[in-house]
């Protein structure tokens, strides 16, 4: 009875949560009765803690509504339900014959393999050991991405296959790819994990065709345990590469081998890529990596300074983080310049010193992002009139873009709430605060608003 009610509870959660939240936290759970207790099994500690912290009240409320005082007790555990452990697993799809020990590749490509031991080393050589989960600075902007990546590292080929990470440049997607690779190799040193840029895949295929080595190319890519491809959007308009990757993708998934892809945009928005590929990109889990919010930018600067052996005052970190907002790479580059100048001049790192060291960068940023620029960009994006930003109209088609513009002004400029309100037709600062909170809430609940906000930040920060 309780287990069947759990299926109904899943339906309730699917209605109340976003598709991404449901896929990441609820779908992996398994349920089984143990006496008068319903045990929910999570695949790992991270999922267990998250569900218990975020969703336990919704689950308890549902069971109380349905069963009253007869509602079962709830307990969480890690692993799979005992009854499932006794079931013989279905045989994995046959893996393509690698032929590593018989065939020597004829070209100097990623698949130039002579023997199996060398193959293992070759597969792992491009996973950067410096990129770990421990040194990935987590914030609201990348929390789901990191959580999904950690689960893939623990259970490659499992629930999130493929995992598709998308967002602007310099936001940490590549860091997460390497962190997953390092996690997989730590758990299984013999795992064949390949990371590459999409252009490398194209180059390998072209060389294979030129050297009549296409079969070796296929064997190589279809025999790996995990394939991570960065910037998949560069497959656009490369028909033969897309054709080969389509078959590689299918072969890997049939064998339960992990695939992770990254792009600068949502899968369906990638122009020049076949629909059948874009559809497959969304088969697993798709997660947005957004520009870091202020607190995360500060944490990134403090972590980088600590790694460099530099004492960075809090007020300096906040000064830089409030002015440089586009991506992690820009933040780290700015800090490197500050550190180099400090080492060269012997001067202490103060706000005045940073203002001088980053003069050109700060001037460019302040010139690019203004409230007026934000209003024009948002109005154009939503196809409304610029005058609507200042008007008193309250229809959703106008009010929602106006709220988005206010939230962006709060995040991307140094203007105070009253100053932002003045720029939007003399509105009160409480109106701006309400808009910021409303958009923050909608970014959690609405995929469309989340996408719009991320797209606008990329446009304004480029």
From Swiss-Prot:
Region Domain II, residue ranges: 84-125
Entry GO MF terms: ATP binding; ATP hydrolysis activity; DNA replication origin binding; lipid binding
Single GO biological process annotation from the record: DNA replication initiation
Domain III, AAA+ region: region residues: 126-342
InterPro entries: AAA+_ATPase, Chromosome_initiator_DnaA, Chromosome_initiator_DnaA-like, Chromosome_initiator_DnaA_CS, DnaA_C, DnaA_dom, DnaA_N_dom, DnaA_N_sf
Annotated positions binding ATP: 170, 172-174
Region annotation (Domain I, interacts with DnaA modulators) ranges: 1-84
Record keywords, A-Z: ATP-binding, Cytoplasm, DNA replication, DNA-binding, Lipid-binding, Nucleotide-binding
GO cellular component annotations of the record: cytoplasm; plasma membrane
Region: Domain IV, binds dsDNA, residue numbers: 343-462
Pfam families in alphabetical order: Bac_DnaA, Bac_DnaA_C, DnaA_N, Hda_lid
Localisation: Cytoplasm
Domain notes: Domain I is involved in oligomerization and binding regulators, domain II is flexibile and of varying length in different bacteria, domain III forms the AAA+ region, while domain IV binds dsDNA.
Quaternary structure and interacting proteins, as annotated: Oligomerizes as a right-handed, spiral filament on DNA at oriC.
Reported function: Plays an essential role in the initiation and regulation of chromosomal replication. ATP-DnaA binds to the origin of replication (oriC) to initiate formation of the DNA replication initiation complex once per cell cycle. Binds the DnaA box (a 9 base pair repeat at the origin) and separates the double-stranded (ds)DNA. Forms a right-handed helical filament on oriC DNA; dsDNA binds to the exterior of the filament while single-stranded (ss)DNA is stabiized in the filament's interior.
Family that this chain belongs to: Belongs to the DnaA family.
HAMAP family linked: DnaA_bact (MF_00377)
Protein name: Chromosomal replication initiator protein DnaA
Lineage of origin: Bacteria, Pseudomonadati, Pseudomonadota, Gammaproteobacteria, Alteromonadales
